[in-house]
Design a protein with these regions (language model features):
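Individual transmembrane alpha-helices with interfacial aromatic-anchor signatures
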Residues: 104-109, 113
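Bulky hydrophobic segments
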Residues: 1-101, 105, 119-133
Length: 133
């Protein structure tokens, strides 16, 4: 019971944070000055704004993949399609209803990669746990 309560609480907290980030009226990184990005790209050419944004979108959905895999152990495979659906809904809402945000299919791709990583983490952990038992 304690494990389920902890997972449910974690899922609720994650959902709130995800909603705040996804539905914030402006890009959440709008406070970062553009001169910072120019300096960073000049200093380390590999690190571009687009790559950082793509990586952030991956990281944003790793917890969703983990949580869905743990909450639905018998249907773990649903984690990735569910994450794709959540991401598509977020991008649609951003594109249609939030004028300060931009919808992007690349965000959906990154989010699905993140959820897949989360699912893989759980699968590897379960496999390692079974080997020890």
């Amino acid at each position: 019971v304690r494990r389920e309560a902890l997972l449910a609480a974690s899922a609720c907290i994650y959902a709130i944070v995800l909603a705040l980030i996804a539905f914030w009226p402006q890009h959440v990184d709008s406070a970062v000055p553009s001169r910072f990005w120019r300096m960073l790209e000049t200093t380390i050419p590999f690190i571009t704004y687009e790559r950082v944004e793509f990586g952030a979108n991956i990281l944003l959905f790793v917890p969703l993949g983990i949580l869905l895999a743990l909450l639905l152990p018998a249907r773990r495979w649903l984690a990735v399609p569910s994450a794709a659906l959540v991401s598509a809904v977020i991008e649609t809402v951003q594109g249609v209803f939030i004028s300060g945000r931009t919808a992007s299919i690349l965000d959906v791709v990154a989010n699905v990669i993140g959820a897949s990583i989360g699912l893989a983490i759980v699968a590897i952990a379960y496999r390692a746990r079974r080997r020890r038992a």
